[in-house]
Amino acid sequence: MEKLLKILIIDDEEPILSNLCSFLNYKNFDVTSASDGLEGLKLFEKDPKGFDLIITDIVMPKLSGMSLISIIKKKSPNTPIIAITGWGEYPEALALESQADKVFSKPFELSELDKTINELISSKKQKVQD
C-alpha cells in the first residue's frame, strides 16, 4: 500500500480550514491542521521533514504566513508551500516576496488547488531523484 502524502494546512478562518481538510482527506492525503501561524510552526518543528507539502494563509494572528514561510524555507527548503490570501491582486508578486511556490487568492477553485498540489509534489519527487 502506498504511503499517504502528508499535508499541513494553516488558516485562522475555520470554514476555510475545515473545507480544505475535508477536501484533501477525500483526495486521500494525510492532513494535519493548525488555526494560526504559531500552532502551525510548532507542528512543523516537531518533524521538519514530515510534511510533503504545506498550505498556509498569509494574514493570521500570532505569526504571519510570510514569517512562517520564511522560517520553514530556511529549515526545509525543498518542502513545497502554497500560500492563500484574501488580499492578493498580484499573486505572482506575492509568491516571490513570500518564497511560496504558489499563491492562491481567495476564493479559489479546489480543482485548481488539487492540480497544483499534484504538480508541486511531482516536482519535489523529481528533485529528490536528480
Could you tell me what each predicted segment is?
Residues 67, 87-104, 111, 115:
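Alpha4 helix (beta4-alpha4-beta5 surface) of REC/receiver domains from two-component response regulators
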Residues 11, 57:
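Active-site residues of response regulator receiver
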Residues 35-39, 64-67:
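Acidic catalytic/metal-coordinating carboxylates
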Residues 60:
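Receiver (REC) domain active-site loop signature in two-component systems and cognate sites
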Residues 14-32:
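Two-component/phosphorelay signaling modules centered on CheY-like receiver
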Residues 42, 66-78:
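Short amphipathic alpha-helix used as the core "switch/output" element in two-component signaling
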Residues 108-119, 125:
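C-terminal output helix
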